A protein has these predicted regions:
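Conserved beta-alpha-beta core of the PfkB/ribokinase-like small-molecule kinase fold
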Residues: 120, 124-197, 219
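Hydrophobic/aromatic residues located in beta-strands of well-ordered beta-sheets
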Residues: 42-44, 148, 211
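Structural alpha-helical scaffold elements that stabilize or flank donor/cofactor-binding regions
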Residues: 6, 113-114, 166-167, 204
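Conserved phosphate-binding/catalytic region of the ribokinase-like
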Residues: 1-4, 192-299
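Glycine-rich phosphate/adenosyl-contacting loop at the front of the ribokinase-like
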Residues: 1-67, 240
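Conserved N-terminal subdomain of the carbohydrate kinase-like
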Residues: 41-125, 296-299
């Protein structure tokens, strides 16, 4: 196993906009896509239907040079879709049930994770709404022992307090937004008006290496296990299209930084910069390597 091959687990789907345009998405897919652009060749574990959308995903991954070893085909369930509406530049999601990514089968990837070493396992909270995919993730964690980057993506109604708490307890690094931080605080019985102090409490409760909190146009901050606080300044978006996938770009650069031993302040600044670039395109993925070169030139 190559030293810097992260394992990315979870949904791949199509974001369908009001004008009926559709673009590939899903936080784990977006993160894997960006990491491929950054040269890490991630091992992406997901599931698509045996349908036209599934074929489009497979072809898109091939064209980008991504590995297909962990992508399963499903004859019974469709490739995931999400209806996206944009209000004041912010996306709202209608996430459909019983999608292929809900049924990721561990037996299909068992030989790819047993006795294998991965430096990092990324996952979110949506793809584990269903017991089958949830159990597959559990087995991956057991078999690999990889350190976990948890991306909190609260999407109604596909979450529960128990689900979020269990994933936090197994995580090493966590990324969430300010609203999700407040929700975690409610779940854990924490309270504080100051976001920084609240994040420090959550970091301590779950023994995290660090917690990243994104603040939209106000930037982001990291608090680590030693209560060291780093803040980033916001980056202007010249031509805002939408914010779909901006957080996923942020996560990908954060993971790249972790695997390259960047200081927390460096992670923040570069992740915020890259997320701002995502806000200038429709959808969540880029086909232009120049965007990634901005990060790689300083790696």
């Amino acid at each position: 196993m190559k030293k810097n091959v992260p394992l990315i687990f979870g949904e791949v789907l199509f974001d369908i906009f009001e004008n009926k345009n559709s673009v590939p998405g899903g936080a784990p897919f977006n993160v894997a896509w960006h990491l491929q652009g950054l040269g890490l060749q991630p091992f992406f574990v997901s599931r698509v239907g045996s349908d036209g959308n599934g074929n489009r995903i497979i072809q898109r991954m091939k064209d980008w040079g991504m590995s297909l070893r962990g992508v399963q085909r499903d004859d019974r369930h469709p490739t995931g879709t999400v209806s996206v509406t944009i209000s004041n530049g912010e996306p709202e999601f209608d996430i459909h049930p019983e999608q292929a990514y809900d049924f990721i089968d561990f037996s299909r990837i068992k030989n790819l994770v047993e006795n294998k070493s991965y430096p990092l396992l990324y996952h979110g909270t949506l793809a584990i709404r269903n017991e089958i995919s949830r159990n597959t993730l559990k087995m991956i964690k057991q078999k690999t022992g990889a350190k976990v980057f948890l991306d909190i993506n609260i999407r109604e109604p596909w979450w529960s307090s128990e689900l979020v708490t269990l994933q936090l307890a197994a995580a090493n690094w966590v990324k969430c937004n300010a609203d999700e931080l407040k929700l975690i605080a409610e779940i854990t019985g924490s309270s504080d008006e100051n976001l920084y102090e609240l994040a420090a409490k959550i970091c301590k409760i779950f023994s995290l290496d660090f917690l990243i909190v994104t603040l939209g146009e106000r930037g982001a901050f990291i608090i680590d296990k030693n209560e060291q606080l780093n803040k980033s300044r916001p980056r202007p978006v010249a031509n805002l299209v939408d914010t779909v996938g901006a957080g996923d770009g942020f996560s990908a650069v954060s993971i790249f930084g972790i695997l390259n031993n960047w200081q927390n302040q460096v992670i923040l600044e570069r992740a915020v910069e890259f997320a701002a670039k995502i806000c200038g395109i429709r959808g969540a993925t880029l086909n232009d390597h120049n965007y990634y070169d901005l990060i790689l030139r300083r790696a």
